Amino acid sequence: MKQEFHEYRTSNAMDWDTMLSLVRKLYRDGDYRMSLLIGCGCFFGLRISDILTLTWSMILDGDKFTIYEKKTGKRRVVKVNKGFQKHVKACYDALKITNEDEKCFLSRKKMVYSTQRINILFKEIKTKYNLKIDHFSTHTMRKTFGRKVFESAGTDAPLALMRLQTLFNHASPTITKKYLGITDSELESSYDLLDF
């Protein structure tokens, strides 16, 4: 009997502009839930298990919402970006939602998507939109969020790494650095941003 070995592949972060373009293309093509899902994942930095618990009332109107993370049980307050909230409203209207307490990510059968199903859909999206990313999965969204926060920090990159460690509930900045694929040279380049 032939034994199969499954290689574990870690997902990659997506370039921020590529992500925004993908979210807009999915919306344009009528794939409102996937557009919203990828947007929520990249703007909120949540694990997929927490994204799938979101209801429309949580993300539609308020400037923040509170969840208890499934994996850790910890309370987390998530701020909703004003620009992204307009996209949430557009998806809500396009889907003709009538119940704000409905989960955001329901299939046609009115069941919440499974992580496995989303990963299958992501493979299809990667092919259809010719995404230049090695491993596109549900982890990609969280890593994209982390990478954007880190890269936007400039000279405060080490501080951003510590903040991300807290947001991601990692035991140390080293774990966060490895999770996001941040190299020592990227951290050291923070010092090159300073002028004298």
Where do the protein language model's features map onto the residues?
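Short basic/aromatic active-site micro-motif
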Residues: K132-S152
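Active-site-proximal segment of tyrosine recombinases
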Residues: D50-I51, G146, G154-N169
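Basic, Lys/Arg- and aromatic-enriched nucleic-acid-binding interface segment
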Residues: K2, M14-F44, T155-D156, A160
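C-terminal secondary-structure termini that scaffold catalytic or DNA-interacting sites
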Residues: M1-M14, D195-F196
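Catalytic-site neighborhood detector that most strongly recognizes the C-terminal catalytic loop/helix
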Residues: E69-G73, F168-L193
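Alpha-helix N-cap/helix-start motif at helix boundaries, enriched for small hydrophobics
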Residues: L37, G45, S49-L54, L164
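Conserved tyrosine-mediated DNA breakage-rejoining catalytic core shared by Y-recombinases
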Residues: T18, T53-Q85
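C-terminal catalytic core of Y-nucleophile DNA break-rejoin enzymes
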Residues: Y8, K70-K89, D101-K123
